[in-house]
């Protein structure tokens, strides 16, 4: 290795170490009030660090999937940074018609068969409720986030946000039952901050949904007669 290259490495190494040391983590605990006003772990709650610029940088490499499988969407909750593209493969041996009437992103991917896939890009942060125009039991939620550091709470309601720059960090959360949360955390360099989030999901009810035409779904029938 040349002396010049060695000097460059010598200059860059302290910088890399300093940047690594400056990052910390946020340990999040989420609880949600259920219909009986009991606090239960917020399993599946999406939490993230707000950083729109980082979201834009991460978007080109973000291509999560929401698959149609066994007349269900898998996963039920997915996450993508704003500007990212989501894949919607059909893994069933029947047709599906993925659509959304959400204000954040209205779209209709049309009918497509087994083995085919469609894609959709999402620009506006917020939850997007996704359905199938043929099968009313199919429902998913895509959470479009304005950040690049995110996690979903486990069955115990805990999540860890890692590699967070030291200093003040704005954290947001979204839960299907309990709605939204925004808070500010002071992240220590090389250390961990704790954040407890309490959400009220006591009023949550699955009210069902209409088809893409805003009408009730027809009675269930054999899939072969649907199209």
Predicted regions and their residues:
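Extracytoplasmic copper-binding redox domains, predominantly the cupredoxin/blue-copper superfamily
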Residues: 23-227
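Bacterial N-terminal signal peptides
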Residues: 9-20
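Bacterial N-terminal signal peptides that target proteins for export
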Residues: 1-11
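A detector of low-complexity, intrinsically disordered, Ser/Thr/Gly/Pro/Ala-rich segments
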Residues: 4-5, 18, 27
């Amino acid at each position: 290795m040349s002396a010049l290259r060695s000097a460059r490495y010598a200059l860059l190494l302290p910088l890399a170490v300093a940047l690594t040391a400056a990052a910390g983590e946020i340990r999040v605990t989420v609880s949600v009030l259920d219909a009986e006003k009991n606090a239960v772990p917020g399993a599946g709650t999406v939490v993230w660090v707000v950083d729109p610029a980082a979201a834009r940088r991460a978007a080109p490499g973000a291509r999560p999937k929401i698959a149609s499988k066994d007349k269900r969407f898998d996963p039920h909750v997915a996450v993508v940074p704003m500007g990212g593209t989501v894949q919607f493969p059909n893994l069933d041996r029947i047709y599906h018609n993925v659509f959304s009437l959400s204000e954040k992103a209205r779209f209709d991917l049309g009918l497509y068969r087994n083995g085919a896939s469609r894609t959709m890009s999402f620009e506006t942060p917020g939850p997007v409720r996704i359905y199938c125009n043929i099968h009313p039991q199919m429902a998913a939620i895509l959470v479009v986030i304005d950040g690049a550091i995110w996690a979903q709470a486990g069955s115990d309601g805990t999540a860890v946000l890692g590699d967070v720059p030291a200093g003040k960090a704005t954290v947001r959360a979204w839960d299907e039952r309990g709605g939204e949360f925004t808070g500010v955390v002071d992240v220590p360099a090389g250390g961990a901050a704790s954040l407890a989030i309490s959400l009220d999901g006591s009023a949550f009810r699955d009210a069902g949904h209409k088809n893409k035409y805003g009408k009730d779904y027809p009675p269930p029938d054999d899939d072969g007669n649907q199209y």
